Amino acid sequence: MTSPADATTEVAVSQESVAMVTGAGRGIGAATAERLAAEGMAVIVVDRTEQDTRATVAAIRTAGGRARGIGCDVAVAQAVTAAVATAVEEFGRIDVLVNCAGINRDRLLLTMGDQEWDTVLDVNLGGTMRCSFAVGRHMRRQGHGRIINFSSVAARGNAGQTNYATAKGAIAGFTRTLAAELGPHGVTVNAIAPGFVATPMVDELAERLGGDRDSVMSEAAKSSAVGRIGTPEEIAATVVFVARPESGYLTGETVHVDGGRP
């Protein structure tokens, strides 16, 4: 059994550690990759294509960090297996996995087609499962690791997002169950549920609503106790906290970072 003293010596955020972040080409994923690199980790930047990873990789390297971009569609099992194999071959291990890849296809259920439903679940939930499976096997052999998934406050229910809310709600259950399975092997599994955050998705939402970015953010801020929306950097800071060795007693939880949304 691991003692409290042993827990503080686990490999997590350190200059010898390696993190893999999916959906890291923009938004929260990019901010997370850059923050982990700033903490001294080598970061495997994963997005749908290698080209999508280049801006984040360049930002990390410009700041003096270590990064490698890998193109991978998390909806394809073979692509995930290949990406993880490449990462392990090049870096030797993966200490932190951040499952940040996600999409939305918002539409009321009664007007939603099978493809819009299936695609959202396959990327958000299926991608989390595939990456956790591939990386979790390596972490189990290592005897340590952090898996950090992304749920959302939308899991509580949000009109026009039955597909997205279902996927994000399922991730919370997936997280708690996987934590029980991997805990005996020194691997913690947690999820982060952001509220409304200023990312490129805001522009996409504004376009769908026929409004502008500022008006969408202003309206969203009204539902927050702190009177504003969040930033990708604030979510990234939470990822770093969960990834730290000192957080080894935290597992199976979904951490809400939503500015006090009711």
Swiss-Prot record:
Pathway: Antibiotic biosynthesis; novobiocin biosynthesis. The active site is at Y164 (proton acceptor). It is an enzyme of class 1 (oxidoreductase). It comes from the Bacteria. Keywords: Antibiotic biosynthesis, NADP, Oxidoreductase. PANTHER family: 3-OXOACYL-[ACYL-CARRIER-PROTEIN] REDUCTASE, CHLOROPLASTIC, SHORT-CHAIN DEHYDROGENASES/REDUCTASES FAMILY MEMBER. Catalytic subunit of the NovJ(2)K(2) heterotetramer that catalyzes the NADPH-dependent reduction of the tyrosyl moiety of L-beta-OH-Tyr-S-NovH intermediate to yield the tethered beta-ketotyrosyl-S-NovH in the novobiocin biosynthesis pathway. Novobiocin is an aminocoumarin family antibiotic that targets bacterial DNA gyrases. This is Short-chain reductase protein NovJ. It comes from Streptomyces niveus (Streptomyces spheroides). Its EC number is 1.1.1.-. NCBIfam families: PRK12826.1-2. Substrate binds at S152. NADP(+) binds at G23, A24, G25, R26, D73, V74, Y164, A165, T166, A167, K168. One of its GO terms (molecular function) is oxidoreductase activity, acting on the CH-OH group of donors, NAD or NADP as acceptor. The keyword RNA-binding does not apply. SMART domains: PKS_KR (SM00822). Belongs to the short-chain dehydrogenases/reductases (SDR) family. It holds the Pfam family adh_short_C2. Heterotetramer; the NovJ(2)K(2) heterotetramer is composed of subunits of 2 NovJ and 2 subunits of NovK. One of its GO terms (biological process) is fatty acid elongation.
